[in-house]
Amino acid sequence: MKLFKIEDYVKLENPTPGEMHRPEILLSKHNAKALGGMLGLLPAGCQVPYHYHKNRESIIIFISGEGIEIIEGEEFPVKAGDVLFIPAGEKHTTINRSNSDLRYLEFFTCPPVTADFFEVKEDQR
């Protein structure tokens, strides 16, 4: 069992100020076999590379700030309190166009986070 306290992740200081920080927070050491989890911390002006997952499904829980999620070329505004499901195969990215941090918790199948991550080149979008 692992308890995730949102206020702890909202208050967490970014160890790489001005840069994206995405540590894994749910690992096999927590007895997680089919799920993984990570904190996404996107400072103002940062963007996750446009990508997709062949097998992974994700639930993203936005916990502070606001941003844009682009899924298959369509923009969706997101903010604290929003929850997003992304099925396997959908190309997506998260962008922070605001002046403050955007933070989210992401829980996903097929861990670890790097195992099923395929960046989409500009000409493939």
What does each model-identified segment do?
Residues 39, 85, 99-116:
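A short hydrophobic beta-strand segment most commonly corresponding to one strand
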Residues 41-43, 52-71, 107-110:
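Short, conserved beta-strand element in jelly-roll/cupin
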Residues 50, 69-70, 86, 92-98:
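Short beta-strand His + acidic residue motifs that chelate non-heme Fe in jelly-roll/DSBH
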